[in-house]
Amino acid sequence: SLGNFKQKNVVNALSEGCGFAHLSGHGSPGMWMAKDFTEDPQGKYLLGLDVYHMPLLSNKGEYPIVVIGGCHNSMFNATFLGSLIGCIKSLTGNPTWYWMPIPECFGWWLVKQPGGGAIATFGCTGLGLGTVGDSNHDNIPDSLQFLLTWLELRFFEVYAQNGISILGQAYG
């Protein structure tokens, strides 16, 4: 982060419209976050976007395909009651995937926004698979070379370099 990674800046950037968006980071059914390693070697969580700020998206007519890299961001069986119970459990010392009550998951909220949001989203319905460090000492972060982020980046590679423009074929 350059120190300006804030939720309002994410909303503003997406509201400008784009063809694709890659939200790489961490998440829950109701929010997506990035990590800032500049001040903390373990990484400090920075809120990128939550479902309650999605109605502020105003990219009408320019709806991107959004690839979401975070755990549970596309957990399609999220419900308000389930998330409320999950939040209560978390507050009483039994952590769950929910950090706030939500009626539907992050991925679906992006698609269903009138006048903003996305035309399609791809994301994890459960835990994502990430890694940190540089285990093979090639000066390329493992997060780019392995597991979930590697898969996400292959989608863009297949689209851009292989010319596959049918969404299901590009992601499959």
Where are these regions (language model features)?
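Cysteine-dependent hydrolase recognition
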Residues: 1-172
